Amino acid sequence: MGLRVDVLVNNAGFGKWAHFLNESLDTYDQMLSLNMDALVKLTYLCVPDMLAYGKGGVINVASTASFQPIPYQAVYAASKAFVLNLTEALAGEYRGRGVHFLALCPGNTATNFMSTANANTTGMPFSTPEEVAEAGLNAFVNGKSCHIHGRANYLSSLLPRVLSRAVVTKIVAGMFKNRVAP
């Protein structure tokens, strides 16, 4: 077709706030297919041409959920941890070859994600999509392999490094329990 992708942005994804067994396997299949499979396939298809030209890049939208287990978002958080780890691995694998990889990890962003996720968003702070996109592009241009948008999000990503994962999981479960239907 003669098309060339200079920068691939894998931004599509969805999640659900629910008790694990309250969602269908079909929902989880769709989530994993979009959040992981589509991202891998698009990256696999676009990167060879970037390597051939000696330049290009991939921005994969992960999440602040990538950094710790998230009760009531177990499958979503696991899928975003996959995105983060894949992206950082590819950044290391292709370093110095002209193709740059960035995992963009936003927190709550004012999109339709939360309504699709069935989340109770009362009192939650949100960034605008424009703020997240600008921060992501700046991180990409500056050669970062991971960018966490927002100071509070960055600090929360450090919790699993200073506290045990069990403690972090208990804290997160307490924070999010009232955000899902019983």
Predicted features along the sequence, with ranges:
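Substrate-binding pocket helix/loop in short-chain dehydrogenase/reductase
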Residues: 19-20, 27-32
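Active-site loop immediately N-terminal to the catalytic Tyr-X3-Lys motif
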Residues: 21, 70-74
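Active-site-adjacent segment of SDR/Rossmann-fold oxidoreductases
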Residues: 68, 89-100
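Conserved NAD(P)H cofactor-binding loop of Rossmann-fold oxidoreductase domains
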Residues: 11-16
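Active-site helix of classical SDR
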Residues: 43, 79
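C-terminal helical subdomain
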Residues: 103, 121-157
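Residue(s) in the substrate-gating loop at a strand-loop-helix junction
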Residues: 63
